C-alpha cells in the first residue's frame, strides 16, 4: 500500500486539512452506509472509508502513516531513528498508548458513541450599498440535514428501537490483534457490524433509511448590523446541520456580499464621491448639492478650484460596526474640459484668453527627464 491510498479513498489531497478530511468522510460514509446503500460492494467501500478516516483523523496516526504507510499507522513502526522513544513523538503515544494497545484500554482512542456537533453551513446574502450602511433584516431560506421527523432521529422504524450491538456489546469498537516487530499488539478499531454506533437498527426508518437525518427546508431571520462590508460573516448558533449521537446542531454562517454603488465608493467607514465641475464653476466658484447616503448636502466651491481638490464632509460616511462613530465622506473635484464648442463660445474663449495672462508654469524637469532628453537627442 502506498502512502496516499487512504487519502485517495476519501478523495482528498495529502495536504488536506482536518476539516476537509472530516467533510469528505461524512459525505462518503453517508453514501456507502449499509443501511442506505444496498448495492454490491457498498459495505466494503464503507469499511475502507472507515479505516482511512480512523487513521487520518488522528494526528499521530496520520503522521506515522505519511512516513511509513499503513504499517506505521497500525503501530508497526516507531518514529524516526527506530522506535522514537516513549515521549509521544514516535509510533506510540507513550506508556499509556502501549498499555492501551496490549490490553484494549482507553488510551487516546476516541469514543465513537460520543455526541458530535453537526456540520456548519454557509449562506451568502446580497445587500445593496445602502442596506450595508444602515443595516437591515433578511429572511434566509435554505435546506439542511435535520433530525428525521418520522423516527425522531433514532433511525429506527416507528414502534421499534435500536438494540445493543451483539459484536461490540455497545462499545462501538472491537479489539484486533496485529503482529508487529515487538510481537503481537492489540488495538481498537471501529466495529464492523454497527459501524461505531454501538447499536444495531434491525428495522430502519423508511424516511431516513436509518441515518436519523433527513433533508428539510429551513428559514431563519437574520439581523444585519449597520456598517457591514463584503466578506464579513454573521454566526447563527444552532442553525446548521443536525448533530450525531444526540450532539447539538452546527452553526450557520451568513456571508455578506455588498453590491457596488453607481455613485459612491467605500473603504471601511469612509465614503468617496467624485464631483465633476465645468471650468466656469471651478474658476468663479459655486454652490452645489452633493449626494450622500444621509441626504443631499450643500457644498461651497471656492474660486480657482483645481482638479484633485478634496472636500471633507464630516459624519457623512458609514457607521462603525463597533457602534458610536460615523465616518466621513470625501468629495474629489474633477474639472471637465468642454468639447464641441460652437463658434460664439470659441470667440468668447479667445477674447477671454486675450484679456489676461493664461500661461501655465511648465513642470520643472527632474533628473530623469534630463536623461530622457539626452537619449532623445535634445
Swiss-Prot record:
Top-level taxon of origin: Bacteria
Major location (coarse): cytoplasm
Residues involved in Zn(2+) 1 binding: 148, 151, 205, 208
GO terms classed as biological process: chaperone cofactor-dependent protein refolding; DNA replication; protein refolding; response to heat
Keyword DNA damage: no
Subcellular location: Cytoplasm
Pfam (any one): DnaJ
Domain J: start-end pairs: 5-69
CXXCXGXG motif repeats: 148-155, 165-172, 191-198, 205-212
MF-aspect GO terms: ATP binding; heat shock protein binding; unfolded protein binding; zinc ion binding
ZnF start-end (CR-type): 135-217
PROSITE patterns: DNAJ_1, DNAJ_2, ZF_CR
Function in brief: Participates actively in the response to hyperosmotic and heat shock by preventing the aggregation of stress-denatured proteins and by disaggregating proteins, also in an autonomous, DnaK-independent fashion. Unfolded proteins bind initially to DnaJ; upon interaction with the DnaJ-bound protein, DnaK hydrolyzes its bound ATP, resulting in the formation of a stable complex. GrpE releases ADP from DnaK; ATP binding to DnaK triggers the release of the substrate protein, thus completing the reaction cycle.
Assembly description: Homodimer.
NCBIfam families on file: DnaJ_bact, PRK10767.1, PRK14276.1
Domain topic, free-text comment: The J domain is necessary and sufficient to stimulate DnaK ATPase activity. Zinc center 1 plays an important role in the autonomous, DnaK-independent chaperone activity of DnaJ. Zinc center 2 is essential for interaction with DnaK and for DnaJ activity.
Family annotation (HAMAP family): DnaJ (MF_01152)
Stated name of the protein: Chaperone protein DnaJ
The organism of origin for this protein: Streptococcus pneumoniae serotype 4 (strain ATCC BAA-334 / TIGR4)
Gene that specifies this protein: dnaJ
Amino acid at each position: 500500500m502506498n502512502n496516499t491510498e487512504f487519502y485517495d479513498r476519501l478523495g482528498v489531497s495529502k495536504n488536506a486539512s482536518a476539516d476537509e478530511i472530516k467533510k469528505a468522510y461524512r459525505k462518503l460514509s453517508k453514501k456507502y452506509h449499509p443501511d442506505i446503500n444496498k448495492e454490491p460492494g457498498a459495505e466494503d467501500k464503507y469499511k475502507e472509508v472507515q479505516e482511512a478516516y480512523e487513521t487520518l483523523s488522528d494526528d499521530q496516526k496520520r503522521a506515522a502513516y505519511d512516513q511509513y504507510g499503513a504499517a506505521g499507522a497500525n503501530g508497526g513502526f516507531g518514529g524516526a531513528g527506530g522506535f522514537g522513544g516513549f515521549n509521544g513523538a514516535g509510533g506510540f503515544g507513550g506508556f499509556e498508548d502501549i498499555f492501551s494497545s496490549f490490553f484494549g484500554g482507553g488510551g487516546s482512542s476516541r469514543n465513537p458513541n460520543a455526541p458530535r456537533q453537526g456540520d456548519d453551513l454557509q449562506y451568502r446574502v446580497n445587500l445593496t450599498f445602502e442596506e450595508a450602511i444602515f443595516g437591515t433584516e433578511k429572511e434566509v431560506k435554505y435546506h439542511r440535514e435535520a433530525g428525521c421527523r418520522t423516527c425522531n432521529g433514532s433511525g429506527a422504524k416507528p414502534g421499534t428501537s435500536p438494540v445493543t450491538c451483539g459484536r461490540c456489546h455497545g462499545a462501538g469498537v472491537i479489539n484486533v490483534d496485529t503482529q508487529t516487530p515487538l510481537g503481537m499488539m492489540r488495538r481498537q478499531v471501529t466495529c464492523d457490524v454497527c459501524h461505531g454506533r454501538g447499536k444495531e437498527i434491525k428495522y430502519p426508518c423508511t424516511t431516513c433509511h436509518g441515518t436519523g437525518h433527513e433533508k428539510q427546508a429551513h428559514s431563519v431571520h437574520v439581523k444585519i448590523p449597520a456598517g457591514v462590508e463584503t466578506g464579513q460573516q454573521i454566526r447563527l448558533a444552532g442553525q446548521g446541520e443536525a448533530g450525531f449521537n444526540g450532539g447539538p446542531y452546527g452553526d450557520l454562517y451568513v456571508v455578506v456580499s455588498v453590491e457596488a454603488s453607481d455613485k459612491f465608493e467605500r473603504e471601511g467607514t469612509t465614503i468617496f464621491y467624485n464631483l465633476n465641475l465645468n471650468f466656469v464653476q471651478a474658476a468663479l466658484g459655486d454652490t452645489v448639492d452633493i449626494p450622500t447616503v444621509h441626504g443631499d448636502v450643500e457644498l461651497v466651491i471656492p474660486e480657482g478650484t483645481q482638479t484633485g481638490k478634496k472636500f471633507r464632509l464630516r459624519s457623512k460616511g458609514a457607521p462603525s460596526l463597533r457602534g458610536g462613530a460615523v465616518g466621513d465622506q470625501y468629495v474629489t473635484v474633477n474639472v471637465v474640459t468642454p468639447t464641441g464648442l460652437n463658434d460664439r463660445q470659441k470667440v468668447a474663449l479667445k477674447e477671454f484668453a486675450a484679456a489676461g495672462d493664461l500661461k501655465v508654469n511648465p513642470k520643472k524637469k527632474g533628473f530623469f527627464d534630463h536623461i530622457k532628453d539626452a537619449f532623445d537627442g535634445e
